[in-house]
Swiss-Prot record:
Keywords: ATP-binding, Cytoplasm, Ligase, Nucleotide-binding, RNA-binding, tRNA processing, tRNA-binding. One of its GO terms (biological process) is tRNA modification. NCBIfam families: PRK13671.1. Belongs to the TmcAL family. Its EC number is 6.3.4.-. It holds the Pfam family HIGH_NTase1. It comes from the Bacteria. One of its GO terms (cellular component) is cytoplasm. This is tRNA(Met) cytidine acetate ligase. GO terms for molecular function: ATP binding; ligase activity, forming carbon-nitrogen bonds; tRNA binding. It comes from Mycoplasmopsis synoviae (strain 53).
Length: 307
């Protein structure tokens, strides 16, 4: 652990919404590094998974400042709605420019030393890593699945939990670019997409689900949240999206960010069969395309973000 001088400590966040788990993380930093300056890089309007964030940026920034965050950096939509390794690259680059000393992230396993060891192994054995990854991609696997299988094959380690995936990608960026940043994983209060609360903690996805169901979330967040405004529910964009897909040739859809590997044809085929967002997304998910990939690509077309 670094000597507690006036350190700069970075966190990659979405705060979708801001809740007690985030307060726990910020308090942990303040307790362990009382003289530190906390710098966060926060997604703007949309999450890495391709959903609309349920609190406006300014409000999330306000709550972060209330809990002693010194500086809030904005991660643009283009840089946010990317696969984990590209999202991590964009976020860590931004924090490195701020000359942070430590990166803190929540993790299911908290084994940052093992993650560092494996990231170093990958850097030193790029050829065999890339060959194995290519083999697993050719087997019809999505990139995250192929990456997971490759790591399992080469190191016999399992990084399949959502926050371990992101945490590992952060560490890979630090190692690959020789950033002078010490990564520290702290135990998450609840799982990333956990459907069960724990004492005063609930995952952001569970809080959003509770808000949609009209349930009280005051036990899990200091923010006065009663419901998610309809304009911030991604499912309410489906009619607009459907009209656009129906009238737009596949060749034009290919010009949008993340539209590759024939995904434009898949969208054209399935759009005729479904009348709501969730059924459409479900139908597009396959061994080749993860749910997150489909959701992010949907958003790129909806927002007309070009390559």
């Amino acid at each position: 652990m670094l000597i507690n001088k006036n350190l700069k400590i970075g966190i990659v966040v979405e705060y979708n919404p801001f809740h007690n788990g985030h307060i726990y993380q910020l308090n942990w930093i303040k307790n362990n590094y009382p003289n530190s300056k906390i710098i966060i890089v926060m997604s703007h309007k949309y999450s890495q998974r391709g959903e609309i964030i349920c609190m406006p940026f300014w409000k999330r920034k306000l709550w972060a400042k209330k809990y002693d965050v010194s500086k809030v950096l904005k991660l643009s939509t283009r840089k946010t709605i990317q696969a984990a390794h590209i999202f991590a690259q964009n976020a860590i680059q931004k924090l490195n420019k701020e000359k942070i000393d430590i990166l803190v992230f929540g993790s299911e396993s908290t084994n940052d030393s093992l993650m560092l060891k494996i990231a170093t192994f990958i850097k030193e054995n790029k050829e065999i890593y890339n060959q194995t990854l290519k083999k697993n991609l050719k087997g019809g696997n999505s990139f995250p699945k192929a990456n997971f299988l490759t790591l399992k094959e080469l190191t016999n380690e399992d990084f399949s939990l959502p926050n371990d995936i992101l945490g590992f990608e952060y560490i890979k960026q630090i190692v690959e670019n020789n950033y002078k940043i010490q990564p520290i994983a702290i135990k998450r209060s609840v799982g990333f997409h956990s459907e069960e609360p724990s004492d005063e903690f609930a995952s952001a996805s569970l809080i959003r689900k509770m808000l949609k169901d009209g349930r009280d979330v005051s036990k899990y967040t200091p923010v006065d949240l009663k419901q998610i405004p309809t304009k911030l529910l991604i499912e309410n964009t489906f009619l607009k999206f459907k009209k656009y897909i129906l009238k737009t040739p596949a060749s034009k859809l290919k010009k949008y960010l993340l539209v590759d590997e024939g995904i434009e044809n898949l969208f054209k085929k399935n759009i005729l069969l479904f009348d709501n967002y969730h059924d459409f997304i479900d139908a597009c998910v396959s061994r080749r395309y993860t749910r997150s990939k489909i959701m992010r690509t949907y958003l790129c077309i909806l927002l007309k973000i070009k390559k």
